């Protein structure tokens, strides 16, 4: 078990992430025990584990999270979702989670007023805050704005768009007639363009860009709606759980009886075009108002569909009123309802074969005669002509006269059915175009300065059967994702580089290759489809084959059998293709691509409706619009038209300021109070929001040019401030407002603000005169104060400089005095020492005279002898003083002669005293002898000390020699590496690109799998594993293992070296490795365990560093930064066993600088004792805290995990110290003595060391 049991987030297939604790460090994975016992223990790769904070997180802006990672991001969304806080920021991007219910007062008029004019971040996140930011940015920057609302189907894009428009129209004043009409457009567009799908009850089946135009005073003056790609196939067919467009059901449920009679309307069961779900949306009240004759059998059995937003009966009346407010008369509204009803009746016209007709023609069935009559009446065409146009078409040959021969070509049943459906689609789609045109006519603008555009377009779609509509929708989403990547990720990072902000680079998946695959001019899918459609006999199988042929080796395009969904693998190669989109792989069935790409009718059918009596239908199909020969099928490319429209939209978005709202679908069942973590996480990843979170950890989303900020204030600046440079003025402004230096950063041309600091930013950018004058006054005050402070500091600096010069002069004199004294002592020290040595004899003679004074006999003789010795001493000293070049040998000879005479005199004295005072003299002589012995012992001790000092100097010199040799070897190795690096640089760059590409492919495979699982759950299908990704000839299913990157040559060589070792420790637990280190006597096993043990420690500490808290100081540094960084400058080496056995103990001491500590406590010392290649003891000394002493075997998690070679300590000058120096500090600070466990391990590693109890 690990001692470090911090909370972590670990990946889970259902919840996204769950909390747990790391209990084991494996060779390649961590073992995590979930805190919730209903989840089993699991082992996961390091990349699937993230640090966790204690306690739940609830932050308005995800950039405020203490730990910024996708797990804490998801947890914050989930926590807020269950608190009904559905909005969250990522910097200035709004994340909106669909609550699937109404939240009280969330969009009330009072809420609109509350957000009016308030800075982003000043109030809780809200869609109104984004709308208000767009208005203020438009006003300040004099630039039109766009709000892009994106997300999956059912994520809440349509509702977010409605509330955005509501705020834009109601925020400043009560809505006038123009604002009311803009808002009335929503129910009309939803009725004709929205439908129930399996994933969304109110799914927009078209895209729209709604522009709200403003004048110079920022008052609404008009609007304009652009729409894209209405899903026409839904008009004729729907799946069992889906419905046609809402307007059909509204008309059947809510139309008055008189209108229903006029339009001959019945119940949904009566119409082939309503063959899907036939239930109405209704609540308890409106259910009673719908006549029973209008209810389908299914509705009567199961009851109505429930939705808090949709009600077919009520919405028909809302639609009728909205059309009236948009300026349509009752006659015009009746014309619209008539065409809607005509489409329903047209769908009921069926065909049957004509008996005995050899040409294979067909006729309208007898049961459909009534539907034919009603349809012709509603369309205003002759019944016979309609019948003829549906079952045949007229063609005109090229020869046989001036105009050629007219030929009546009968149609087969399926051809007639296709013609009928094409007419229905044409009528409805052109009616939709007309309605959008009427809305635009009702909200015209004469003069517009700026506009705010809201983009709501169908989200990424994937079904069991995907056709041309899904292909176009997903292509659009690819373009929007590319715009998001460029606008937020790519361009943002390029701006940071240009401005020199030193923001770490964030990698993201660029989907430009998918867009090129679809829209390339020469061989893009759209181009190939158009070319196929122009052929005399187009074939979808030939088109599909051309797609596969043109893009045979493109990673983004695959065969249907490569899909993970079993249902898709049944398609033949010529029946479809698979595209790996940014959100996941989608398999498209191409059977109807050619038909759906053609937006034209047979000329005979178009001519029929052009000559009708219905005025509205004549408007939809104006005469002269078709220039084709009668009977020929025109070709109008839907794909090319959509691509052109999308290109124009992208140009608009690129010219505008941009705001993003990312809508998130919390669950697939569309119910409230349920949050599926894996589903939400997949959406966040696919939308690029996770990458934005990583970028904004260091990013600055708000910025303004120095020049723009200065020009904004220039008009109110006093004369003394006008001459200031723009940057100087901005710096003075920020200092005067007491803004924290962490909240902003100055670039080369702009000032940038951190996320969540929009209040301060808006405070500066607010252009009202009172605010500007107040800021200018503060700037002036700060400038005056700062100049006085600078003057005072200047004077103080001059005084300090003068004192420094005086101090240096004194230091020079002291240094000179010391140097002269040192030189003199060095020159004369031997003579000083010789004189001192001889003078010691003079001192001994005093005792001799004292003893001789007590003699009764021979006193004069002894004193005479002493005087002779004095003369000898004086003569010797005089000779030494007079002869500067006297040698040590000569001085020793003089000392020996004098000492011999002294000894002789002492012997005589002893002889004379022996008889007189034998006992007393013997005691005195013993003391003299002891003094002489003590002197001799002191002399020997001094000589021993000098020898030890010389030995220590020799050892240090040897250490320095070794260091220099190692340094020279390192320099030579670096030179060799540099030369080799130049040769290998291209190869390494290629490998890096391959690694990045391969990682993207693995991430794409994971997304494909998740998407297939979601689709399989919806359709009760099966998911199969796709073929493994192959890279550089290595299959992921091979022994190399899944998801393994192909490393560089150095790394592969190290892996091979490790693989050849005697012991396989990959399956050993962390605790087993530590026990083996502490107990084993097998040297080879011991070292193998130590290498594996420290390798796992490195991986663990690298993971902790990556997932540390943003505010964490470097209190937990295990070694000085220079030591840790040295490991990245060279590859680790695998040390041979024979070198390990003879490894020696080495000791080091280097300064320890903590970057975040106060200045007075910043410096410390770090001591390390290495037993061979691995650390055995570690000590950290700081003045402000107790010493930290760590011992291997018990404190491994807190100790340096690098090998001695990796630390680079052996190459640091002055870093290595002697054993006694380390032990002296270790024991002084309370450390126990280091012990080896016996002779079995003479140079034992850390396992042989125990921390004494």
Curated annotation (Swiss-Prot):
Residues 1233-1253 are annotated as: Disordered. Transmembrane segments: none annotated. GO terms for cellular component: actin cytoskeleton; basal part of cell; cell cortex; cytoplasm; endocytic vesicle; germline ring canal; growth cone; investment cone. Residues 57-766 form the Myosin motor domain. Residues 808-837 form the IQ domain. GO terms for molecular function: actin binding; actin filament binding; ATP binding; calmodulin binding; microfilament motor activity; microtubule binding; myosin light chain binding; myosin VI light chain binding. It is found in: Cytoplasm, Cytoskeleton. It comes from the Eukaryota. Its main location: cytoplasm. Residues 3-54 form the Myosin N-terminal SH3-like domain. Residues 647-666 are annotated as: Actin-binding. SMART domains: MYSc. Isoform B is present at a higher level in the head and gonads than in the thoraxes. Isoform 145 kDa is found only in the head. CLIP-190 and jar are coexpressed at several times in development and in a number of tissues, including embryonic axonal neuron processes and posterior pole. Residues 900-1022 form a coiled coil. CDD domains: CBD_MYO6-like, MYSc_Myo6, MyUb_Myo6, UDM1_RNF168_RNF169-like. Residues 1187-1193 are annotated as: Hydrophobic region. The keyword Transmembrane helix does not apply. GO terms for biological process: actin cytoskeleton organization; actin filament organization; actin filament-based movement; asymmetric protein localization involved in cell fate determination; basal protein localization; border follicle cell migration; cell-cell junction maintenance; dorsal closure. PROSITE patterns: IQ (PS50096), MYOSIN_MOTOR (PS51456), SH3_LIKE (PS51844). Myosin is a protein that binds to actin and has ATPase activity that is activated by actin. Together CLIP-190 and jar may coordinate the interaction between the actin and microtubule cytoskeleton. May link endocytic vesicles to microtubules and may be involved in transport in the early embryo and in the dynamic process of dorsal closure. It is believed that its function changes during the life cycle. Belongs to the TRAFAC class myosin-kinesin ATPase superfamily. Myosin family. This is Myosin heavy chain 95F. It comes from Drosophila melanogaster (Fruit fly). The gene is jar.
């Amino acid at each position: 078990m690990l001692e470090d049991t911090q909370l972590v987030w670990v990946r889970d297939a259902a919840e996204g992430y769950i909390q747990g604790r790391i209990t084991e460090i494996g060779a390649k994975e961590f073992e995590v025990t979930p805190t919730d016992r209903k989840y089993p223990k699991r082992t996961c790769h390091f990349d699937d584990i993230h640090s966790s904070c204690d306690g739940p997180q609830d932050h308005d802006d995800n950039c405020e999270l203490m730990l910024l990672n996708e797990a804490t991001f998801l947890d914050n969304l989930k926590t807020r979702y269950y608190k009904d806080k559905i909005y969250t920021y990522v910097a200035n991007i709004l994340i909106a989670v669909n609550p699937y219910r109404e939240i009280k007062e969330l969009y009330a008029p009072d809420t609109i007023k509350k957000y009016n004019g308030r800075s982003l971040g000043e109030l809780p996140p809200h869609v109104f805050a984004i709308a208000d930011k767009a208005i203020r940015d438009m006003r300040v920057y004099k630039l039109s704005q766009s709000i892009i609302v994106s997300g999956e189907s059912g994520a809440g894009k349509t509702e977010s768009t409605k509330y955005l428009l509501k705020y834009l129209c109601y925020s400043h004043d009560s809505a006038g007639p123009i604002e009311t009409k803009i808002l009335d457009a929503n129910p009309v567009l939803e009725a004709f363009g929205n439908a129930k799908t399996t994933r969304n009850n109110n799914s927009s089946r078209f895209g729209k860009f709604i522009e709200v135009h403003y004048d110079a005073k920022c008052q609404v003056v008009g609007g304009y709606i652009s729409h894209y790609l209405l899903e026409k196939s839904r008009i004729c067919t729907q799946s069992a759980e889906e419905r046609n467009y809402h307007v059909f059901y509204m008309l059947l449920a809510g139309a008055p009886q008189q209108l229903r009679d006029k339009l001959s309307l019945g119940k949904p069961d009566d119409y082939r075009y309503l063959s899907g779900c036939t239930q109405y949306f209704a609540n308890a009240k409106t259910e009673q108002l719908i006549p029973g004759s209008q209810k389908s059998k299914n509705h009567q059995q199961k009851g109505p569909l429930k939705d808090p937003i949709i009600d077919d009966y009520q919405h028909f009346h809302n639609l009728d009123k909205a059309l009236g407010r948009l300026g349509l008369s009752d006659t015009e509204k009746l014309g619209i309802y008539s065409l809607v009803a005509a489409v329903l009746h047209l769908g009921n016209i069926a065909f049957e074969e004509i008996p005995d007709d050899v040409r294979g023609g067909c006729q309208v069935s007898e049961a459909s005669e009534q539907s034919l009559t009603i349809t012709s009446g509603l369309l205003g065409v002759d019944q016979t002509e309609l019948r003829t146009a549906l079952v045949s078409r007229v063609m005109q040959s090229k020869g046989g006269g001036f105009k050629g021969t007219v030929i009546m070509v009968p149609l087969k049943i399926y051809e007639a059915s296709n013609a009928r459906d094409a007419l229905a689609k044409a009528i409805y789609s052109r009616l939709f175009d007309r309605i959008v045109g009427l809305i635009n006519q009702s909200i015209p603008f004469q003069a517009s300065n700026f506009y705010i555009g809201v983009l709501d377009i169908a989200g990424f779609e994937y079904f069991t059967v995907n056709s041309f509509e899904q292909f176009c929708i997903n292509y659009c989403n690819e373009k929007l994702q590319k715009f998001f990547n460029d606008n937020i990720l790519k361009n943002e990072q390029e701006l940071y580089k240009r401005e020199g902000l030193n923001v770490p680079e964030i990698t993201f998946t660029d989907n430009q290759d998918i867009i090129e695959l679809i829209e390339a001019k020469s061989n893009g899918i759209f181009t190939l489809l158009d070319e196929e459609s122009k052929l005399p006999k187009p074939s979808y199988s030939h088109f599909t084959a051309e797609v596969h042929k043109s893009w045979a080796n493109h990673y983004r395009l695959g065969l249907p059998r490569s899909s993970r969904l079993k249902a898709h693998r049944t398609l033949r190669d010529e029946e479809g293709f698979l595209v790996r989109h940014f959100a996941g792989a989608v398999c498209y069935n191409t059977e109807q691509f050619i038909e759906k790409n053609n937006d034209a009718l047979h000329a005979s059918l178009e001519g029929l409706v052009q000559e009708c009596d219905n005025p509205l239908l004549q408007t939809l199909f104006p005469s002269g619009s078709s220039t084709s020969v009668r009977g020929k099928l025109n070709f109008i490319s839907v794909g090319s038209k959509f691509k052109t429209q999308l290109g124009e939209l992208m140009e608009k978005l690129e010219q505008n300021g941009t705001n993003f709202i990312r809508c998130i679908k919390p669950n697939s069942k569309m119910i409230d109070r349920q949050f599926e973590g894996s589903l939400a996480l997949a959406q966040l990843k696919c939308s690029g929001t996770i990458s934005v979170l990583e970028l904004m950890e260091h990013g600055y989303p708000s910025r303004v040019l120095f020049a723009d900020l200065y020009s904004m204030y220039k008009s109110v600046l006093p004369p003394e401030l006008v001459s200031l440079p723009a940057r100087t003025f901005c710096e003075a402004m920020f200092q005067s407002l007491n803004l924290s230096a962490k909240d902003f950063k100055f670039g080369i041309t702009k000032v940038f603000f951190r996320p969540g600091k929009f209040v301060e930013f808006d405070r500066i950018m607010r252009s009202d005169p009172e605010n500007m004058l107040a800021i200018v006054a503060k700037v002036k005050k700060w400038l005056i104060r700062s100049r006085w402070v600078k003057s005072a500091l200047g004077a103080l600096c001059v005084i300090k400089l003068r004192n420094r010069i005086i101090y240096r002069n004194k230091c020079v004199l002291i240094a000179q005095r010391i140097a002269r004294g040192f030189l003199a002592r060095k020159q004369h020290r031997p003579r000083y020492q010789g004189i001192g040595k001889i003078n010691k004899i003079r001192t001994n003679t005093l005792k001799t005279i004292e003893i001789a004074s007590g003699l009764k006999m021979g006193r004069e003789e002894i004193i005479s002898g002493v005087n002779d010795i004095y003369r000898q001493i004086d003569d010797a000293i005089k000779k030494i003083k007079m002869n500067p070049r006297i040698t040590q040998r000569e001085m020793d000879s003089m000392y020996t002669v004098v000492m011999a005479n002294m000894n002789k005199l002492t012997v005589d004295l002893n002889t004379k005293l022996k008889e007189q005072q034998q006992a007393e003299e013997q005691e005195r002589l013993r003391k003299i002898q002891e003094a002489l012995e003590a002197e001799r012992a002191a002399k020997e001790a001094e000589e021993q000390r000098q020898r030890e000092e010389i030995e220590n100097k020799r050892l240090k010199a040897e250490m320095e020699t070794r260091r220099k040799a190692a340094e020279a070897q390192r320099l030579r190795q670096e030179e060799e590496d540099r030369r080799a690096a130049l040769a290998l640089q291209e190869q390494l760059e290629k490998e890096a690109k391959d690694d990045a590409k391969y990682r993207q492919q693995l991430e794409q495979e994971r997304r494909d799998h998740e998407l297939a699982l979601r689709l399989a759950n919806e359709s009760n299908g099966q998911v199969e594993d796709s073929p493994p990704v192959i890279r550089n000839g290595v299959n992921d299913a091979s022994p190399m293992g899944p998801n393994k990157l192909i490393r560089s040559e150095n790394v592969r060589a190290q892996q091979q070296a490790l693989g050849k070792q005697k012991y396989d420790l990959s399956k050993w637990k962390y605790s087993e490795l530590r026990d083996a280190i502490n107990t084993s006597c097998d040297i080879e096993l011991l070292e193998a365990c130590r290498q594996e043990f420290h390798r796992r420690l490195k991986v663990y500490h690298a993971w902790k560093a990556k997932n540390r808290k943003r505010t964490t100081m470097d209190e937990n540094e295990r070694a000085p930064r220079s030591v840790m960084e040295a490991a990245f400058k060279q590859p680790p080496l695998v040390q041979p066993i024979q070198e390990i056995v003879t490894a020696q103990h080495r000791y080091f001491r280097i300064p320890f600088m903590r970057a975040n500590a106060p200045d007075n406590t910043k410096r410390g010392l770090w001591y390390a004792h290495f037993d061979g290649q691995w650390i055995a003891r570690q000590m950290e000394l700081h003045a402000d805290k107790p010493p930290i002493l760590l011992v291997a075997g018990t404190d491994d998690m807190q100790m340096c995990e690098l090998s001695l070679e990796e630390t680079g300590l052996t190459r640091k000058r002055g870093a290595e110290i002697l054993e006694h120096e380390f032990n002296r500090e270790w024991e002084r600070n309370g450390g126990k003595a280091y012990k080896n466990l016996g002779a079995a391990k003479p140079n034992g590693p850390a396992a042989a060391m125990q921390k004494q109890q």
